Amino acid sequence: MELNFTKMEGLGNDFVMLDDRNGAIVQTVPYPVLAKKLCSRRFGVGGDGIIIIIDSETADVGFKIFNPDGSEPEMCGNGMRCFAKLVFEQGIVTKQRFTVETLAGTIIPEILLSDTRQVEAICVDMGEPILEPDRIPFKCNRQRAVNEQIQVKGETVSITAVSMGNPHAVIFVDDVKKIDLENLGRAIETHELFPAKTNVEFVTVLNDQELVMRVWERGAGETLACGTGASAVLVAASLNGLTRETALVHLAGGDLSIHWDQQSNHLFKTGPATHVFTGRIKI
């Protein structure tokens, strides 16, 4: 079987996009197996994940994502911007604001057009942050895991746990460049206090409107950007009294603008998505 695919990236977080609205792909090969093959940067297309366009009975379109190790996360913010741009430009949806079914619930992206009606950016309503430990999930006796101390490799690390439909452990440090991300990130990702594992963000606060972060993604390792992670970081920073409700988050792949609307309690993330190339691959 040969598959048509589109390679997309959002701030360097890259994905292999597939249209399986007719179900032909999943009938041929399981998505986790396909993810392992296509995400290989030596033997496949290469990517931080595969994203599948599927039909939905509850939203305008359905979204599924699989990590390079075959695991299925609930959602991906950068992937959602790529997804939204692709389905809009391909005419799968025609509205600039539409609904997407994900494992994290219904997500609402909005396409922002230039004067020439080109896709300039995508603003994604990420929904409400989840702060109750049992829903993140994170093993904790408090109502919120804010500045919670845990033991990691014999050291005490202060984390704030947030879910944006997927779990995040946010750690504030003096200089993110000096962090041994692979060792610490992997240890926290698989920490026993996170029964579903977790994404890990190390953050340096520049001022009350700017943050710098590095991310270790659950099932993918270090990536250049993470949209749900940037959203979780703003929530964690705000809960710790470090930032305002709107901030610019600097990631290795570029910048995201994050706004936490206090009236609706929703997070809004705005950033770019780029078409890299299209192709066909035999599986």
Curated annotation (Swiss-Prot):
Which residues are involved in binding substrate? 13, 67, 77-78, 166, 199, 217-218, 227-228
InterPro entries, alphabetically? DAP_epimerase_AS, DAP_epimerase_DapF
Location(s), subcellular: Cytoplasm
Entry annotation: catalytic residues: 76 (proton donor), 226 (proton acceptor)
Q: Tell me, which GO biological process terms does this entry list?
A: lysine biosynthetic process via diaminopimelate
Complex and partners: Homodimer.
Q: Which protein are we looking at?
A: Diaminopimelate epimerase
- Source species of the chain: Desulforapulum autotrophicum (strain ATCC 43914 / DSM 3382 / VKM B-1955 / HRM2)
Q: What is the lineage of its organism?
A: Bacteria, Pseudomonadati, Thermodesulfobacteriota, Desulfobacteria, Desulfobacterales
| Gene name, Swiss-Prot/TrEMBL | dapF
